[in-house]
Amino acid sequence: MTSNPETPVVSNVTLSELRSDVNKRGTIDSYIYGPDEQVTTYFVREIRPCAAFSKMPVLLNTGNGSNKFGGTFTMPINASGDYLLALTAYISISAGKLRSYAAGTESSYFPKLAHKLIKSVRLKVDAKPLVELSSNFMDTWSEFMIDGGNYEAYTNMVGGDFQYSRSVDIGAKTLVLPIPLYFSRDSGVALPIGMMVNNRVTVEFVFRKLSDLLIKENVPDTGAGTGFMNMLTDGDFATPPEITKFEVVADFAVVTDFEIDRTSCSPHYILMEKPTDIAATEILKPTEAGSTLSYDIEHSSGILKALFFGVRNITHSEYLDYYEVGLPKSNNGVRSIGVSALSKIGIKCGDRYRVPMLPAEHFVFTEPYRAACRVPTRNRGQYMYSFALDLKTVDPKGSINPSNFNSSISVVIEPSEALRNSAETFEFTAIALTSYILYIDNGSLKKIDNGGDFN
């Protein structure tokens, strides 16, 4: 037996090789999938009869623009397979060193750093956004839709909690961000990129500046601290952190020739989900107990599946995801916990309550328990209401179409006593999760209600 000192060159499997494997049928395959002519799925739907397919991860590491702090980076997604299943970003940030350190101060990146670093992700078709996921959406979605068994691991993947440094050193970071695109939850609505021969598909990442991500707080060894001091900037560093690696893995599916032929014969209809961030509105605090405030939810046409909303504390707007009354401070080394900003919440369609005024806890505990994947351990001021029976599935069952009854949607809130008496500043934020129908016709992707314009 001889040894070969040379490192073997391992090539990636090709599309044609993978399709050849998928087309092969053995005895067990016939029992699992049945004959091709009996498969009526448009691709593959979880826990339902499905066509044969094989998954193929592809590394995306080239693009246009800047994949550094404050930059915008666009990566092409070529048709390396028949369907796009998922996207995951891998990010490395180098260590940094401050010019000086003062006793009684601590520095840290914000929690879930990957959500904060990437201000938005836009999946585009012919330069028009098909889906845009904001930093706010990723934070909120993870709070309710990452199940309890995976929540801790997911939080660590995307950057962990506050990790304070009491020195001039800021540690390096390795981040993994599974991008929560709707089709990553159900391959039955995977993006049929192989059929979109007339479209150009890209993914665009917008990065926040370093000065938006690193915070300094006053945390004395004993006694109460004053909390927020300032954000760290490049000028505070002898060696500023840098993004040293940014890569994306795209998971594709390769299906059989029969599946491709069948879906090429007629228009191909697919359900999609799209979150829309509603413009934030500063809250004018009422002085009387029981007073309510109403906020319109302006969203584009589509089936309304769920609402996510909250009252963000913007006294120090540098805190990107703080939704409580009472700014965070340290007392004898323990970080303070704020209190809820709301007492009751209702949802109106037109001039009638679709959801009556209910205790705020209904929207942070009961609703997630019934319809989502995770119930927050305490009321952190982020709320949800799902019109659909099961928010995790892409099935829109229970969703409403406000245009059918020509009504607007609004969220009505009753501020808590703590908010009414607080000198702090707040804003109302909301995200509408809506469903649409896409279709493929003659090699082009279009949205059925909007003539191909994905905005």
UniProtKB/Swiss-Prot annotation:
GO terms for cellular component: viral capsid. Its main location: virion. One of its GO terms (molecular function) is structural molecule activity. It is found in: Virion. Keywords: Capsid protein, Virion. It holds the Pfam family Capsid_N. InterPro entries: Capsid_N, MCP_C, MCP_C_sf, VP_dsDNA_II. Belongs to the ascoviridae capsid protein family. Major protein of the capsid. This is Major capsid protein. It comes from Heliothis virescens ascovirus 3e (HvAV-3e).
